[in-house]
Amino acid sequence: MIVALDALSKEPSLDHVRFGTPFALHNKWCREKYFRTRRYFQLIEVLLHRGFKVYLTDLYKIYVGGAGLLKEDKNRFGEVLREEIELINPEAIMTWGKKAERAITKIKIYRPHHAYPHPSGANGRQLSKVIGCSPTDENIIDHWTQYLAPRLSLQR
């Protein structure tokens, strides 16, 4: 299971609620072509090609524009996430980014938990520090594969 904070839309609307999959992975163009989202699917493919089933979920279940989430809403999303994890019952949890990492730690889910920097383009500086080179798709995927190998037995 991968838990991450989906990149937020630049066009918030309080009048319309949008539904979709995390990182727009329901959309073939977003999975394969769109430079802002294809990296996420490429990272997931590393796991899929090794026989893992992957469940990706967004930390925040509803996009809220503006100043941010109220503490009460964050707590609600944490409870929904806890129930989601209990329902899915994953072998391990991967988190992308500090917010997802903190959320998993806070709700005290007792599964193997492996934290990785959020792979978004906006996190390029942190990714560069972690992978030790330019954060291109290829370099991030190579590092992700090496990172996962000892943690998830990628010999499958």
Across the structure, where does each feature detected by a protein language model lie?
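A polyanion-binding, active-site-adjacent surface
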Residues: 1-94, 98-102, 107, 117, ...
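A charged, well-structured terminal subsegment
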Residues: 146-156
